[in-house]
Amino acid sequence: MAALSSNWKKLQAKLKEESASKPSLKRKPETPATNPPTKKPKVQKSFTKTLKAAKSAQTSDKKKMGGVHSSKIEETAPGTSTSLALWAEDHDVSAEALAEAYNLGAKDNSMMLAAAKDKINHGLTEGIEIGKYIAIDCEMVGVGPGGHESALARVSIVDFHGVQIYDSYVKPKEKVTNWRTAVSGISQKSMRFARDFEEVQAEIDKLLRGRILVGHDLKHDLEALILSHPGKDIRDTAKFSGFKKYANGRKPSLRVLAQQLLGVEIQGGEHSSIEDARATMLLFRKHKSAFDVDHANRYAPKTASGGGQKGNKPKKKKK
């Protein structure tokens, strides 16, 4: 029995030696020549790059805690994720187009909270890239006998995201007979640092060029500024057909629209033209698709209809 055990051990050792000396018969898996490894799409590479840029931007933001100035991305597109905003910037996509595409910033009324950062009578805000849409609102004072006629005393403009672009008190050219302070919020004291009408008018004219103007009953604001704007580039919340039901078919007030559609109380006391412009822009943004349809119907290009018009039929030759 001991001899058998000894022989078995010798056999095992011999088998191990033989297996070690022989080359492996296993074939390595071949990579098929017809199916080379696919390259990652450039979009993925760009997106990865964007994420890295976003992370580095976030890291630098943490290091700069307490800084006074916010980034351009934060100013122009609140609610946009950093990586998405960076991607838009790299690909020359405007912040407002990005917000419109992803419905960012218009899901709630957070735009109205920006009032805490408003700079009264600041003039033109620097460092903001102004997009396609702007909203305007003006405050008037009374001139003439009894103060029944109106003259411009303040004008405010915000962008698509409710960010203040312009705000200025304006010196009326006529003598003010009624400051209407309880409504306008303007007093004689406000005029100490007011700008001349011509200066304000020139600034507003530049801002309006090539842009879509949003406002409430814009006819009065444009008349006060002695400016005009193409009808196709105007979006007026007072004339929008979808809002007329809130005033029994007539022009609804901005205060009623803000209350009914936004759940926001404005004009409770002294008016703020910045707040009113912001509320108007928010109303437009929340109902933009309906505004677009209404505008398309109103300014649809006229196309010649076939067949039945005079002069289209060939003349018959006389025999």
Swiss-Prot record:
Gene3D superfamilies: Ribonuclease H-like superfamily/Ribonuclease H. It comes from Gibberella zeae (strain ATCC MYA-4620 / CBS 123657 / FGSC 9075 / NRRL 31084 / PH-1) (Wheat head blight fungus). Residues 132-293 form the Exonuclease domain. Residues 1-75, 295-319 are annotated as: Disordered. It is found in: Nucleus. Belongs to the REXO4 family. PANTHER family: RNA EXONUCLEASE 4, RNA EXONUCLEASE REXO1 / RECO3 FAMILY MEMBER-RELATED. This is RNA exonuclease 4. GO terms for molecular function: 3'-5' exonuclease activity; nucleic acid binding. Keywords: Exonuclease, Hydrolase, Nuclease, Nucleus, rRNA processing. Its EC number is 3.1.-.-. InterPro entries: Exonuclease_RNaseT/DNA_pol3, REX4_DEDDh_dom, REXO1/3/4-like, RNaseH-like_sf, RNaseH_sf. Exoribonuclease involved in ribosome biosynthesis. Involved in the processing of ITS1, the internal transcribed spacer localized between the 18S and 5.8S rRNAs. Its main location: nucleus. GO terms for biological process: ribosomal large subunit assembly; rRNA processing. One of its GO terms (cellular component) is nucleus. The gene is REX4.
